[in-house]
């Protein structure tokens, strides 16, 4: 064995993320539904995030695929049933947005309804929430067009890119964009409820998903949630493509057995209907999407003609609002920290009560861009109990 061959073998053994480089995937535009595009896909020159030049598929979709029915999101009253929400506070879990769930939140200090049972519902495209806690139900803008770039030949990155909150994941085969976790109620005080296919409307007026919708019934069954997505459910089918160009499938292999030997991004090299290549799998828990992407994405790979929201190229031109941001910049007993104005009220006092500096507390909680911190791990770093840390942190908004 030559020195070069030996070195490559050692590198392959050292990192599961290097193995897929030898098993490249290629995007097949004909895998998408004919109704996915409002313009025929084009192959164009593009620059990847590592600075290298490449070729990308440029695909353009509308605010919503033709014929796709969405919702419901927010219930009008406690007697109605809305969509779903992945609650990450006390009694964490996936819930239907209904009376039982909203009353539970009320008992925890998050009141989303009036005394007569009317739920606080707000269209943040037209107005900011007037209540401490409101269910967000955004109006659509049928004029919006979305343009995305996907590498024709995926390239493995040196290290995976963590997705965090509202990170760009990819696009489903019906043309709906996919993003990672929606903002937590613990971050903003408000609930951007999802429909039972895991989607909702962005402040810019276009529909997107936060789940693998064609395998979401697997999640509902495991979580004991009485919900169903009207899309055809197939745990072994391809769901879409990630923004790094690698395909995404449901939670099982083609033979119906669970996917095994998955890396931290829930992917591996294996045989698919597209051939043997690296691909991602959905998980059986919500959100059932990859936590990271292993490939290199294209620069400026997502833009919209909207006047608000993610990727908006005409921000502020028609008066649509941006979404509510984390109040005071966090931290809200589990939400992200930091903000333009520095530590929020109560953060320095929390550090003082623990006998540490604000900087030490911030470092223990970790990077705010990664979403809700692991309080148990942060407490362990500080040498205290999780209960002591929770008690010291400022309360969530509106409490």
Model-derived segments and spans:
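Long, compositionally biased interface segments
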Residues: 26-36, 45, 260-340, 399
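Bacterial N-terminal signal peptides that target proteins for export
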Residues: 2-10
């Amino acid at each position: 064995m030559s020195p070069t061959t030996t070195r490559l073998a050692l590198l392959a053994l050292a990192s599961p993320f290097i193995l897929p480089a030898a098993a490249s995937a290629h995007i097949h535009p004909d895998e998408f539904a004919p109704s996915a595009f409002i313009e025929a896909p084009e192959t164009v020159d593009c620059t990847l995030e590592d600075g290298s030049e490449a070729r990308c598929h440029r695909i353009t979709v509308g605010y919503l695929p033709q014929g796709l029915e969405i919702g419901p999101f927010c219930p009008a009253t406690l007697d109605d049933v809305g969509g779903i929400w992945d609650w990450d506070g006390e009694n964490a879990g996936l819930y239907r947005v209904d009376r039982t769930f909203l009353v539970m939140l009320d008992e925890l200090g998050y009141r989303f309804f009036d005394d007569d049972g009317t739920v606080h519902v707000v269209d943040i495209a037209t107005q900011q929430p007037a209540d401490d806690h409101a269910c967000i139900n955004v109006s659509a803008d049928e004029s919006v067009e979305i343009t995305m770039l996907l590498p024709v030949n995926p390239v493995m990155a040196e290290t995976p890119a963590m997705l965090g909150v509202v990170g760009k994941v990819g696009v489903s085969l019906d043309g709906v964009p996919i993003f990672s976790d929606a903002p937590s109620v613990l971050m903003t005080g408000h609930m951007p409820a999802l429909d039972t296919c895991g989607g909702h409307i962005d402040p810019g007026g276009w529909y997107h998903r936060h789940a693998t919708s064609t395998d979401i019934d697997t999640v509902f069954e495991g979580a004991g949630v009485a919900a169903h997505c009207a899309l055809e459910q197939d745990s072994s089918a391809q769901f879409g493509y990630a923004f790094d160009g690698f395909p995404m499938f449901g939670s099982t292999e083609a033979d119906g057995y669970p996917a095994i030997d998955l890396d931290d991004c829930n992917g591996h090299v294996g045989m698919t209907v597209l051939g043997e290549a690296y691909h991602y799998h959905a998980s059986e828990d919500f959100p059932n999407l990859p936590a990271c992407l292993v490939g290199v994405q294209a620069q400026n790979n997502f833009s919209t003609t909207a006047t608000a929201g993610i990727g908006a190229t005409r921000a502020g031109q028609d008066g649509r609002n941006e979404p509510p941001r984390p109040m005071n910049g966090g931290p809200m007993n589990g939400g992200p920290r930091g903000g333009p104005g520095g530590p929020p009220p109560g953060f320095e006092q929390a550090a003082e009560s623990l006998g540490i500096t604000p900087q030490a507390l911030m470092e223990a909680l970790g990077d705010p861009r990664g979403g809700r911190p692991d309080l148990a791990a942060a407490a362990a770093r500080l040498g205290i109990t999780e209960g002591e840390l929770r008690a010291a942190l400022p309360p969530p908004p509106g409490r």
